[in-house]
Amino acid sequence: LERETLKIIYFSKNYTPHDYRFLFSLSQTKHEIFFLQLEATLRQTEDRPVPANVRQILWAGGKREFRWRDVPRLTFDLRRLTKEIKPDLIHAGPIQNCAFIVALGGFRHLLAMSWGYDLVMEADKNWWMKRVTRYTLRKSAFFTSDANVTREKAIAYGMNPEHTVVFPWGIDLEHFRPKDTESRKRKAASSKKKLSVSSKQSKEVTLFCSRTWESIYGVDVLAKAFVKVASVNPDVNLILLGGGSQSARIRQILMNGGVMERVHFGGQVGQGDLPRWYHMADIYISPSHVDGSSVTLMEAMASGLPCLVSDIAGNKEWIEDGVNGWLFRDGDVDDLAEKILSAIKSKREFRRIGELARKTAEERADWRKNFGTLLEAYEKVKSD
């Protein structure tokens, strides 16, 4: 059966690489797509423009950070928009702001999408957030998330389990792929020529983290662990990408530890250039305290990198300790440092573990396959 053309409003808090991925894929369908942004873009994380064939809507939101006192005004304006556009469904998330505003506005065909942190962390913050979460999910026609941990949380807050679908947001497996064997051969040949430094090169290990420098992502935990590792092993380096509100704190930890010269700050890196950074590394580290299915973890796995990640539920859906990566106790600096040093000792295993990580990504993280699940969910929302 041929799917009918739908009018869809995609309503998100900001405009990130994740939003671009959804909007670009939606723009390639026959559906009519509208993009609604809740907040002004304060820290640019996506340098590509909103895809062609997507109509960005000017409305009461999108001008500043979200404030609770603006909710009535935003809700009234969203009602106006739904009367004008007459969408078949609204795809909205995070739960406690975008999806909540749609639920308050009384729009029935709401697909609420969790962004991970909204249910794992925000939902239980206080009585108000609990009420907002419960209200939104009970008013949602359908719910989607990228991990079982968030689906279970949504059900606990009143979402009908039969109206839920889990699919990892996934990545482009052609864009993120292991270094080819030819480049490995070239690297090996060039290192043999540099005999004076060849022994040092063979010992060097580069750690890599691309998480945003916000408290929920635990980059400060990695910084502290790196100071400990560097005091034991002089051949370990660290690459940090991105930035965020913890920038001063993280730099201070590294400066006080006397390891600044062994850390490379790559800044904000566009999607086109990201694979090159993964290829510079030997181990990918994600010290996040909160995650569903982490897209950066999927990128690293697809790039054939062995990954060392916090033992939170979302990560354990992807990493089997000692098989296709390693786990450390969430927030435990000493355990992370020990696991890094232990991994380095088994450097000869990196290739094998990286190959298993790539295999996992190929089986479960293919965006093109996973996106079809979203389109099926749209049909269910429309027919609800």
Predicted regions and their residues:
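Conserved acidic donor-binding segment of nucleotide-sugar-dependent glycosyltransferases
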Residues: 321-322, 326-333, 342-348
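Donor nucleotide-sugar binding/catalytic pocket of nucleotide-sugar-dependent glycosyltransferases
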Residues: 134-182, 187
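Conserved donor-binding/catalytic core segment of Leloir-type glycosyltransferases
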Residues: 9, 196, 201-217, 221-227, ...
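A short, well-ordered alpha-helix in the C-terminal region of glycosyltransferases
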Residues: 335, 342, 349-364, 370
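Short hydrophobic beta-strand element within catalytic cores of glycosyltransferases
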Residues: 306-309
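Nucleotide-activated donor-binding/catalytic signature segment of Leloir-type glycosyltransferases, i.e.
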Residues: 251-269
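Short alpha-helical donor nucleotide-sugar binding micro-motif in glycosyltransferases
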Residues: 82, 137, 268-269, 276-281
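Aromatic "clamp/platform" in nucleotide-sugar-dependent glycosyltransferases that forms part
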Residues: 289
